Amino acid sequence: MVREKKHMEEYRRWLENSQDNDNLKAHLEKMTSEDVIREAFHKDLEFGTSGLRGVMGVGTNRMNEVVISRVTRGVVDYLYERENIIETGKRLKVLISYDGRLYSREFAQKTAEVFAQYGIIPLIFDECTAVSVLSYGIRQLDADLGIMITASHNNKKYNGYKVYDNRGCQILEEAAQAILEKIDKIAYFEYEFRDVRSEGDNITENPVEIQWLDGTIEKRYVNDVIRYFQNMNIVDGKLNLAVVYTPLNGTGKRPVISALEKIGLEKLISVDEQMIIDGKFSTCPNPNPELDQVYELGRNKLKENQCDIVVATDPDCDRAGVFTRNRRLSGNEIGILIFHFLCEMRKRQKDVLGKRRRLYKSIVSTKIVDEIAKANDIEIEKTLIGFKFMGNAMDKSPKKFLFAFEEGNGYLTNNLIRDKDGISAAVLICIVTSWWKKRGKTLEEALKEIYDEYGYFKEENAGYDLEGIKGKKIIENSMSELRENISVYAETLELDMAYDYLTKRAYGSSDNERAAMEKFRGLPESNILEFESCEGVSVIIRPSGTEPKLKIYFSARGAGLNIADAKIEKIKAKTLDVIKGLIHKA
């Protein structure tokens, strides 16, 4: 729930508390427009299962050191209560990582300083590091918690603060709510010991020092990834493949290059301009592997060097994308190729892979993998959108784990960690591409072969960027209007059934209760609406959890790809007309 604040009152309080901080004071004094002050101070930056994410700047609704200090103090209080530190005297460890964004290192160091002040040992990487290395490191170092300073693939204005539990999983709602309750009790600029300190307590009386970590954990993870694939018998010497790699000015440079070198590529070319850590993302303003434009420099290298594919990872290296000689593959298409390959390997190596029989996928990911799974005796566990759900789900049965993915270019290809990973995904993408190349096929031809065998499915996405106070209200009002008139909109879209993941109700079925039970089994409540037809057409609408955006997902099945395409175009046109009307109305 968003708690509105009296923005001018809060602004003046920050001014009063900035007298000893010339930099903060100068930024506050530059805020002469009340609209600017309102946007920055009308509420607290929301903390949830994805932690914090927002535009960097001064204010309670912005990413800055004041906000981070307060939130970290809330995490401290949460840990003190969870671990009963005052009575047990237990000394906790927190692992902290950060990407190469502007101020990420400073935010990470501030986070470490707060933990150290309260007697919690902060272990912090001395260089920006990938998300997967954090998840792996938490498990290897027996850390009690992890913090990742990142805004993933958002543009340069953004930064974020993600919280991981002691299994290397992103926290879920219960933990997020418990932390938020602690944060809410803390006033800005007031981080004294208050309710955690007791007289004579040797934990808070003796602050600890920050411990800086070198690249050992990263190297160990890369080696373990390669060993994991070797144990699966899917890495067998030199790969007849020429690859261009780009980290999009992010953290992937060291680990991905190292991993790709270890699998023996025939040729590995890097995009020099994008190998440099650059928080301004000068070469790709929106560093998202889902966008064609981020591959422009890589495609030039591909043509110059007659390579097979371009592989890209995003700034915190938790997503991976592919551009072939012809086009960018969608996140779903990459997921299809990897999953199909793993199923083929499983057929050939029952003794090694026989027990690995579970696929994890989000509800917006392609449905063709359901057909592939059925044909290959693979269990499917569907989750809500976000690897926080998949990581927590697979942690319950890691030995059964085969693969996890979501349509937004997020893949988990090993059970060493509990979050999506661009490092191991980049490796497996190259292995899969080489496997098909040995059979005389490109990735596009491979996809056609898979569609011919399992059915013709098509997916597309759309989204509306709606920033600021006004944008947030538009998103809220649009979702409310759709929810309150869900059956009417199902009829407008000419779709038979509708599902509300927040109320867990189904509409339009001959047995709504049974339909709801099947659709929502094992899923928590979420602000998602789905519309579906009996002919295999589906529309899912939701607010993004990480961006000021309304997201729409389309999927269709047809007797051929052209028919599936036609169905997508038809439902997309109808849906976008509805959404545009709602936005205009709001």
Predicted features along the sequence, with ranges:
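N-terminal small/polar loop signature for handling phosphorylated ligands or for N-terminal nucleophile
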Residues: 95-158, 261-322
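Gly/Ser/Thr-enriched, mixed-charge loops and adjacent short helices
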Residues: 36-41, 45, 159-296, 301-302
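Short Gly/Thr/Asp-enriched flexible loops that form oxyanion-binding sites at enzyme active sites
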Residues: 107-115, 158-165, 256, 318-338, ...
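Phosphate-binding and adjacent anionic-ligand microenvironments
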Residues: 307-309, 322-325, 345, 349-542, ...
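Glycine-rich phosphate-binding loop plus the immediately following alpha-helix
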Residues: 164-196, 335-336, 340-356, 361-372
